């Protein structure tokens, strides 16, 4: 049985971890980093870049570089007007859902997220040396059903069986509390990431991690603080030069990178200089942006964002039934909690110094890996009791939302209620499933609708319709309605906003596999071309050194084969390069057999581009060829 990995699929960065024995390990990616930018780019040649490679070229390719895709997961097009404005790429309306358009192709947010998940999967496979097929993936605690389902679909597309979707602050609490022995510790997890904010109140003790309440804002995170700085820089430059840099995609991407860098610097310094030479040009010549930003100015500009953090905290504490003074620890999670003002406000609100013992960028992935260990049986004596973040119910007479499951109910859970018809002789009912806290159905999120028909005609209020809500451990909902008189039942697995059909998921999985195959093929092609290049170089070098020792016919054959390989290499055609390399290798082999044993003789280059010689020959020859091999590289 393979390992179940833990993935923190973040708005800005993603992270992967796995249990090694009884300890979780964060895995470094191929670039040597423990976190990977949640970015995907498509180059002009059609190559797909993920992670750091995508981030590096974002300034020169803003239209085709996708970032913060998590903000679009499971969302309808009309739900993301602000997110759409902040994207440098095209967000389009396809069937009412937000999708990304690159060239003439559209991608769902699930597909883009799957590309990031594939990168995390590959990172884990490289580390473990084995195939990975199962994962625990984290989501913001305040993600609704549609967003959770979209995350699960992304995992499927990436070739992962998602064993569990768990809430980010809950995962962080698992990582924080795994080795804690204190009984009944009340912990607040304050999780401010790149795109979302969550606050969860938990009680930890005896290996039980019980979430008492959760709240948050899925539209608040580090990106919003970056945007404050972007707007300030753009406004200041407009005052100075009369040019709005927000209308230039490349300039805007440079502003975005500079804003993120400035925000990070202001966490350890009281001021920073933002210097962007050649940001734009006019008829008078190039224009440069040089602006000084103080921490005090940044904090003043971000005041409204800071204020938004604490209303969810008040609600979460109230719903937990704890007094704020009872909270033993406040654990900071998410990169944005490094902002000094956030830390100061958290201390002021909770009346205690926040706990910074966990790495805010890695702790969620570590918690996901621990949950993977629990599911696998490697971690025992840990019980996780999570909650549903939002109330669930159905629309009843008068357009009212009637709640069946209240927010912050421990999951998994099941709830049944009896409803009846609203009119005489009504033979069918529509079950309109809703999620949210507002009293009117129209103000809440529709998760799905289905009909129960063939109800025997009867006066209103007589038929008994039993509605059952069933939430699994992933927080995903199943609803059924049953006519108690006839036993007729209708059910629906909520497949809400942005939910993909099995056929769509299968197609996307095949596309993802094809892309992986294409990437591998491209890599092999590049390696072959590099080998050919190396072989050309070493052949020319040895012709210069050994030319006068070769018989004229052998030398001519080598030169002819060398020219053929050069032409094939120039054409870039793999089907031409390989035979040309084989031919050159063969004629070198023939020539080497004549030369072998002559003073100063050296064997031929090998087809893989590494010079090499016959074993059992002069040891000095072999040593000399090792040096040539090093030069070739």
From Swiss-Prot:
Phosphothreonine, modified sites: 196
Family, as annotated: Belongs to the heat shock protein 70 family.
Gene: dnaK
Induction remark: By stress conditions e.g. heat shock.
Protein name: Chaperone protein DnaK
NCBIfam families: PRK00290.1 (NF001413), PRK05183.1 (NF003520), prok_dnaK (TIGR02350)
Taxonomic lineage: Bacteria, Pseudomonadati, Chlorobiota, Chlorobiia, Chlorobiales
Family annotation (Pfam families): HSP70
Region: Disordered, residue numbers: 594-633
General function of this protein: Acts as a chaperone.
Biased composition (Gly residues): 610-619
Entry keyword set: ATP-binding, Chaperone, Nucleotide-binding, Phosphoprotein, Stress response
Coiled coil region boundaries: none
The organism of origin for this protein: Chlorobaculum tepidum (strain ATCC 49652 / DSM 12025 / NBRC 103806 / TLS)
Keyword flag Ribosomal protein: no
GO molecular function terms noted in the UniProt entry: ATP binding; ATP-dependent protein folding chaperone; unfolded protein binding
PANTHER family, per database record: HEAT SHOCK PROTEIN 70KDA (PTHR19375)
Highest taxon in the source lineage: Bacteria
CDD domains the record matches: ASKHA_NBD_HSP70_DnaK-like (cd10234)
């Amino acid at each position: 049985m393979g390992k179940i990995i833990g993935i923190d699929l973040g708005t800005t960065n993603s992270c992967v971890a796995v249990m090694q024995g009884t300890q979780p390990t964060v895995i470094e990616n191929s670039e040597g980093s423990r976190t990977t930018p949640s970015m995907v780019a498509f180059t002009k040649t059609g190559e797909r870049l993920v992670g750091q490679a995508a981030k590096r070229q974002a300034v020169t390719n803003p239209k085709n570089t996708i970032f913060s895709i998590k903000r679009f997961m499971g969302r309808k097009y009309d739900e993301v007007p602000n997110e759409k404005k902040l994207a440098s790429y095209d967000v389009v309306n396809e069937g009412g859902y937000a999708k990304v358009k690159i060239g003439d192709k559209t991608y769902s947010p699930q597909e883009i997220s799957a590309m990031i998940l594939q990168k995390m999967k590959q990172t884990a496979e490289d580390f473990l040396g084995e195939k990975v097929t199962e994962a625990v993936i984290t989501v913001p605690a305040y993600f609704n059903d549609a967003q959770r389902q979209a995350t699960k679909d992304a995992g499927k597309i990436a070739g992962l069986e998602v064993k569990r979707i768990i809430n980010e602050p809950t995962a962080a609490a698992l990582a924080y509390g795994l080795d804690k022995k204190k009984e009944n510790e009340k912990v607040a997890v304050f999780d401010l990431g790149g795109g979302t904010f969550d606050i969860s109140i938990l009680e930890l003790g005896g290996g039980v991690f019980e979430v008492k309440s959760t709240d948050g804002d899925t539209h608040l995170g580090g990106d919003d603080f970056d945007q404050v700085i972007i707007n300030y820089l753009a406004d200041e430059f407009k005052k100075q030069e009369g040019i709005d840099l927000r209308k230039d995609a490349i300039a805007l991407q440079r502003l975005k990178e500079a804003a993120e860098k400035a925000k990070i610097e202001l966490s350890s310094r009281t001021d920073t200089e933002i210097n962007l030479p050649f940001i734009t040009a006019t008829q008078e010549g190039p224009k440069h942006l040089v602006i000084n930003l103080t921490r005090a100015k940044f904090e003043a500009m971000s005041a409204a964002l800071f204020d938004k953090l604490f209303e969810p905290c008040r609600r979460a504490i109230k719903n937990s039934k704890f007094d704020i003074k009872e909270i033993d620890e406040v654990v900071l999670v998410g990169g944005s909690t490094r902002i000094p003002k956030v830390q100061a406000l958290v201390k002021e609100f909770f009346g205690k110094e926040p706990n910074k013992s966990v790495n805010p960028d890695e702790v969620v992935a570590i918690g996901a890996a621990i949950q993977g260990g629990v599911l696998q049986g490697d971690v025992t004596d840990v019980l996780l009791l999570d909650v549903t973040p939002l109330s669930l119910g159905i629309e009843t007479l008068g357009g009212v939302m009637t709640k069946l499951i209240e927010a912050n109910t421990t999951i998994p859970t099941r709830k049944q209620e009896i409803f009846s018809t609203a009119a005489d002789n009504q033979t069918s009912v529509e079950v309109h499933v809703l999620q949210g806290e507002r009293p009117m159905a129209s103000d809440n999120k529709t998760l799905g609708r289905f009909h129960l028909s063939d109800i025997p005609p009867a006066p209103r209020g007589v038929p008994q319709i039993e509605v059952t809500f069933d939430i699994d451990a992933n927080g995903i909902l199943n609803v059924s309605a049953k006519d108690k008189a006839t036993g007729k039942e209708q059910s629906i697995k909520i497949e809400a906003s942005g939910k993909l059909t099995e056929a769509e998921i299968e197609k996307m999985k095949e596309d993802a596999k094809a892309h992986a195959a294409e990437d591998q093929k491209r890599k092999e092609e590049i390696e072959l071309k590099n080998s050919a290049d190396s072989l050309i170089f070493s052949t020319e070098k040895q012709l210069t050194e050994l030319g006068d020792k070769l018989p004229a016919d052998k030398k001519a054959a080598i030169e002819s084969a060398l020219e053929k390989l050069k032409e094939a290499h120039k054409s870039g055609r793999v089907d031409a390069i390989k035979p040309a390399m084989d031919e050159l290798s063969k004629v070198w082999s023939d020539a080497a057999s004549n030369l072998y044993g002559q003073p100063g003789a050296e064997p031929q280059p090998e087809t893989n581009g590494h010079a090499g010689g016959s074993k059992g020959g002069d040891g000095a020859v072999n040593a000399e060829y090792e040096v040539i091999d090093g030069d070739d590289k």
